[in-house]
C-alpha cells in the first residue's frame, strides 16, 4: 500500500498571476491537503472519504482521481489494477489548489506504486495536464508548489517547468476560506482579454522586484511589491466582504494580503505571530460566511507532496 499526502497551495500571490505559487502547512500541525491511497487489486476501484467527499462528482469517471489513473495507465501503455482511496480534505473551488491536491497525490501515489517509472519533470507535466481539465487551461502555479514544495516560479523553458524561489522564515500566511465556492473557470472568464500598457509595465515591475527582493533577502520590499493589477481588480466583485477584509488586516498589521488563487480564500502575510493571531481572529469573525469556512495560520510547506506510508 502507498499513501501520499499533497498540501494546499496559494497561487498567484497577488504579484505573479499564473506564474507563482506557494505550498502551505498549518503551524498547528493539521494536514491541510488531500491524501490518496493506492493498493494492488484485481480490478480498479475508487473510494471517496473525507470532510468534502460529498462535494465530489457522483459519476466515478468524472472524478479527477479516476482520470489520473486512466492517464497514468495510458502513459505506461498498460492497465494497472488498483484500489484507490481519495481522502478529500480540501474544499472544492476554494482558491487553495484543491484539484491540484487530488491530482498530485493520485499521480505521485500511482508512480510510487509502480516503482517510479516517471521522473519528476514528466510527472509534473502530467499533473499540469490533468489539473488543466478542471481549471480550463494548463498552468502549474498550484501543482508545482504542491508537488515540489516551497515557493515556485513557473519557467516552462528548456524542459524546466518551475524552480524554487527562496521564501522568508518569518512570514506567516493567514488563510481564510469563507465557505463559499468560486469556480476557477468563472474567475478566469471575468478577466479582460487585453490590458492597458501601464498595467503591463506595473505588473512586470512588481514581479521582477518581488523575485529580486526574495533573492536579496529583503522581506519588507518583497511584501510591498505584492500588488495585483491583473486579476484582483476584476475578481474582488466575486468575493463578498473582500475589500473591507483587506483594509482591516492591513490596519491590524498584515504586511500584504490578496486573493489566494482565484478565490474566495483570502491570504494575509504577517511577520509576527501575535499579529497573525489577531488577523486570524478578525477574519474568523468577519470573513467566514458559514460552517464550512475556516482560518489557518500557516508557514511555507517546504516538503511538498510526500509518502506517508509505503
Swiss-Prot record:
Its EC number is 2.7.1.39. Gene3D superfamilies: 3.30.230.10, GHMP kinase, C-terminal domain. Pathway: Amino-acid biosynthesis; L-threonine biosynthesis; L-threonine from L-aspartate: step 4/5. ATP binds at residues 91-101. GO terms for biological process: threonine biosynthetic process. It catalyses: L-homoserine + ATP = O-phospho-L-homoserine + ADP + H(+). It is an enzyme of class 2 (transferase). GO terms for cellular component: cytoplasm. The keyword Cell membrane does not apply. Its main location: cytoplasm. Keywords: Amino-acid biosynthesis, ATP-binding, Cytoplasm, Kinase, Nucleotide-binding, Threonine biosynthesis, Transferase. One of its GO terms (molecular function) is homoserine kinase activity. It comes from the Bacteria. InterPro entries: GHMP_kinase_C_dom, GHMP_kinase_C_sf, GHMP_kinase_N_dom, GHMP_knse_ATP-bd_CS, Homoserine_kinase, Ribosomal_Su5_D2-typ_SF, Ribsml_uS5_D2-typ_fold_subgr. It is found in: Cytoplasm. PANTHER family: HOMOSERINE KINASE, HOMOSERINE/4-DIPHOSPHOCYTIDYL-2-C-METHYL-D-ERYTHRITOL KINASE. Belongs to the GHMP kinase family. Homoserine kinase subfamily. HAMAP family: Homoser_kinase (MF_00384). Catalyzes the ATP-dependent phosphorylation of L-homoserine to L-homoserine phosphate. This is Homoserine kinase. It comes from Shigella flexneri.
Amino acid at each position: 500500500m502507498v499513501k501520499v499526502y499533497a498540501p494546499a497551495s496559494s497561487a498567484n500571490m497577488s504579484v505573479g498571476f499564473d506564474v507563482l505559487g506557494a505550498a502551505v502547512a498549518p503551524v498547528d500541525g493539521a494536514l491541510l491537503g488531500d491524501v490518496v491511497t493506492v493498493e494492488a487489486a484485481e480490478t480498479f476501484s475508487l473510494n471517496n472519504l473525507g470532510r468534502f467527499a460529498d462535494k465530489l462528482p457522483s459519476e466515478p469517471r468524472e472524478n479527477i482521481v479516476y482520470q489520473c489513473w486512466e492517464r497514468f495507465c495510458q502513459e505506461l501503455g498498460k492497465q494497472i489494477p488498483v484500489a484507490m482511496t481519495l481522502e478529500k480534505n480540501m474544499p472544492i473551488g476554494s482558491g487553495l489548489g484543491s484539484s491540484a491536491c487530488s491530482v498530485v497525490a493520485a499521480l505521485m501515489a500511482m508512480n510510487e506504486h509502480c516503482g517510479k517509472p516517471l521522473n519528476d519533470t514528466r510527472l509534473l507535466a502530467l499533473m499540469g495536464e490533468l489539473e488543466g481539465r478542471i481549471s480550463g487551461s494548463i498552468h502549474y502555479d498550484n501543482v508545482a508548489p504542491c508537488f515540489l514544495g516551497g515557493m515556485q516560479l513557473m519557467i516552462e523553458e528548456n524542459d524546466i517547468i518551475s524552480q524554487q524561489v527562496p521564501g522568508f522564515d518569518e512570514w506567516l500566511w493567514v488563510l481564510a476560506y469563507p465557505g463559499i465556492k468560486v469556480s476557477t473557470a468563472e474567475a478566469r472568464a471575468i478577466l479582460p482579454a487585453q490590458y492597458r500598457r501601464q498595467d503591463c509595465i506595473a505588473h512586470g515591475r512588481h514581479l521582477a522586484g518581488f523575485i529580486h527582493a526574495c533573492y536579496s533577502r529583503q522581506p519588507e520590499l518583497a511584501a510591498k511589491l505584492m500588488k495585483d493589477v491583473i486579476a484582483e481588480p476584476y475578481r474582488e466583485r466575486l468575493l463578498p466582504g473582500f475589500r473591507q477584509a483587506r483594509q482591516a488586516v492591513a490596519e491590524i498589521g498584515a504586511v500584504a494580503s490578496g486573493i489566494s488563487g482565484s478565490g474566495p480564500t483570502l491570504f494575509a502575510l504577517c511577520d509576527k505571530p501575535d499579529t497573525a493571531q489577531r488577523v486570524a481572529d478578525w477574519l474568523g469573525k468577519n470573513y467566514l460566511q458559514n460552517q464550512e469556512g475556516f482560518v489557518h495560520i500557516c508557514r511555507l510547506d517546504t516538503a511538498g507532496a510526500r509518502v506517508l506510508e509505503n
